[in-house]
Amino acid sequence: MRSILVIPSFVAVLNAFSLFPKPHDDFKYLITFGDSYTDNGRLGYYGSHQAHGPPPGVMPPEANVTASGGLQWPQYVEASTGATLYDYAIAGATCDNNNVERWAAFMNANYPSIITDEIPSFKADRKTKLYRGVTSANTVYALWIGTNDLSYTGILSDSQVKGTNITTYIDCLWNVFDAIHAAGGRRFVILNNNALQLTGLYRPLSDGGAGDNQFWQNKTLYNQTEYAQKMLEYTTSSNTMIDYGVPFHLLVKNRWPGSKVAVYDIHSLIMDIYNQPSRYLEPPHNVVGYYKHCDVNGTNCLYGPGRLDSYLWYDELHPSNIIASYIAREFLNVVSGRSKYGTYWEHW
C-alpha cells in the first residue's frame, strides 16, 4: 500500500489509514455512483419507465446478471460485509451530460449522468427514511466514472460538448465529491480508469480485438492502432490527474474538510490480472478475447468457448464476473487501509 507525506500544515497520513477503525465493523452503508462497471440493474428501471428513475425513497430491484455476466462488484461487497448498498450507478452514464452526452435509442433519451441524475436522485433519497441510519462515520461513498466519458462516443472521437475536454471530465469528479460532502459524506473511494486499451473494444482487430461491434459499429473504418494508443494516453493521463488532484483539492484547497479519500488503482489491478492470469482466472486463461459475442446490434449473441471464469473480459468492454469479485475483494482492502492498490489521504 502507498502512504503519502505532505506539508505538515495540511496534515495528510504518515501511514495508510483505514476508512473505518476496524475493518468493516462500522461499514454499514455503501453508496455508489458510476456507469455499467458499477450498475446493479438501475438502468433497467429507467428503460422500463420512460427514462425516469424510481421515486424518492425507493431502490429498484437488484439484477443477478449485470454487465459483468453475473453480479457486479458492489453486490459482492454487500454480500461479504452485510452493508446496505445504495447503488445509483447507471449503465451508459458519463459524469455530466453537459460535457459528454450519449444517446440511448431504447429510451428515446440520453443516458442519465451522475451530475444530472444520480446526484439529484441521491439528494432526494436523503430526505426519506431510506437514509435514517446513514451517518458520516458508518458510510463509504464510491465513485467510478470515465469509461463512457473517454469512449469512442465521447472524448476519443472528439464527440464531447464544444469547449470541454479531459480536464472538464476530471473537474466533474471533484464536483461530485462536493455534492456528497455537502450532504454529509466524509469517507470516499475513487476508482480510477480501467486499462481500456486492453479491452476488445479498443484493442486492434489485428491484435485479437473486436471488429465492428455493438459499442463501435464501424470500428474497422478507423486506424485501430492509433485509437488504441490514444485510449492508453487518455486513461493514463486522466489517472495521473486523479492521483494529483485528490491531495491538491483535499489538502491545499481545503475543499472537503474532515474527509478521508482513497484512490483505488483499478488500472494497475487489471494490468496485474492481464500479466499474471494464472493467479486470477481458471484455465485456460483468456485475457485477450471475451466471452459474449453479439452482432453490431447487440443481438444474436453467442457465448464462450469455455467458462466465463476463464475470461478477463465478459464482452468487448466489460470485465467479467470473476473480475468483479476481485475488484470487490480489493475494494475491502482499500477501505481497510491494507491494499497495495490504494493511495490514502486525510484532512483533519
From Swiss-Prot:
pH dependence: Optimum pH is 5.5.
Subcellular location as annotated: Secreted
Keyword field: Glycoprotein, Hydrolase, Secreted, Signal
A GO molecular-function annotation: acetylesterase activity
EC number: 3.1.1.6
Glycosylation (residues): 64, 165, 218, 223, 297
EC top class named in words: hydrolase
Role played: Acetylesterase that acts as an exo-deacetylase. Shows activity towards naphtyl acetate, triacetin, as well as towards glucose- and xylose acetates. Liberates acetic acid from xylo-oligomers.
Protein name as catalogued: Acetylesterase
Organism, scientific name: Hypocrea jecorina
Upper taxonomic lineage: Eukaryota, Fungi, Dikarya, Ascomycota, Pezizomycotina
Gene name in the database record: aes1
